[in-house]
Amino acid sequence: MKKVTIRDFIKKKSTKEKITMLTAYDYPTAKIISNTGLDSILVGDSLGMVVLGYANTLNVTMRDMISHTRAVARANPPQLIVADMPFLSYEIDTKSAVKNAGLLVKAGSDAIKLEGGEEMKDTVKAIVKAGIPVMGHIGLTPQRFLRLGGFRTIGKTKQEEDQLIKDSLELEDAGVFSLVIENTYVDIAKRITEKLNIPTICIGAGPYCDGQVLVINDLLGLSEFTPYFAKSYVNLKEIISNAINQYIIDVKNNKFPEKQHYKERES
């Protein structure tokens, strides 16, 4: 599989070939993904919740994102690597936003993703001007869950719906190459997808986007809580627990290690 590029992303919209994206946070996972036909890896700030054990993503730092981006990049996957910009790494001013975006690219990402709507237009323009591709993110934006009143579906009111449409158009105009739409109503996501020339990637926003993204822990059945919009394709939590329990039994009953697991001196 050849390296997936920004151009490939945009082409898939015109050919109506669905884009597939999953999160990954470490070398082993990225190495497995590299041997699949997945289009893109998102080094998401969701690592704060599913890897580091935080209650939300607000505690994730640039140091965290750089470290995990490097780990994923070391697997040298052909997938397009997109790294999240963490909370307060891009909101303060455009200068620090460009600098932090550059640090993620130096760590191995092919593009960065940031949350927010029209208020992020100047920031997006500055990062794109610096030569760094930007993926937008609207709808439920986890870094802003306090302002949004919690993790909820966005677009219930006409005002929210109109704002989502406006945000998507403003971000496209600012130069984002793609747009994540999270946890909004399916008809709104469909309208946005039809209005934009750039590909949309849905998570909890229905089937009419140009692609889908999931947190890999949800897909693999590893999460403590799986949101309604995610699908578990395997229950790795159960498989891993069974393996650990079998190991305990084998050790306690002297069934491990067996002869093939150690060496004896020749007599």
UniProtKB/Swiss-Prot annotation:
Compartments annotated for it: namely: Cytoplasm
Q: Which Pfam families match?
A: Pantoate_transf
Report the EC code(s) recorded for this entry. Answer: 2.1.2.11
Primary localization class, coarse? cytoplasm
Locate the active site.
E182
Q: How is the cofactor bound?
A: Binds 1 Mg(2+) ion per subunit.
Q: Where does 3-methyl-2-oxobutanoate bind?
A: D45, S46, D84, K113
Q: Pathway involvement?
A: Cofactor biosynthesis; coenzyme A biosynthesis
* A GO MF term: magnesium ion binding
Q: Which UniProt keywords apply?
A: Coenzyme A biosynthesis, Cytoplasm, Magnesium, Metal-binding, Transferase
Q: One GO cellular component term, please give it.
A: cytoplasm
Root EC class: transferase
Please tell me where Mg(2+) binds in this chain: D45, D84, E115
- Spell out the reaction equation it catalyses: 3-methyl-2-oxobutanoate + (6R)-5,10-methylene-5,6,7,8-tetrahydrofolate + H2O = 2-dehydropantoate + (6S)-5,6,7,8-tetrahydrofolate
Q: Name one GO biological process term.
A: coenzyme A biosynthetic process
Needs which cofactor?
A: Mg(2+)
Subunit (UniProt): Homodecamer; pentamer of dimers.
As for family, the record states:
Belongs to the PanB family.
Q: What does this protein do?
A: Catalyzes the reversible reaction in which hydroxymethyl group from 5,10-methylenetetrahydrofolate is transferred onto alpha-ketoisovalerate to form ketopantoate.
Q: What is this protein called?
A: 3-methyl-2-oxobutanoate hydroxymethyltransferase
This protein's encoding gene? panB
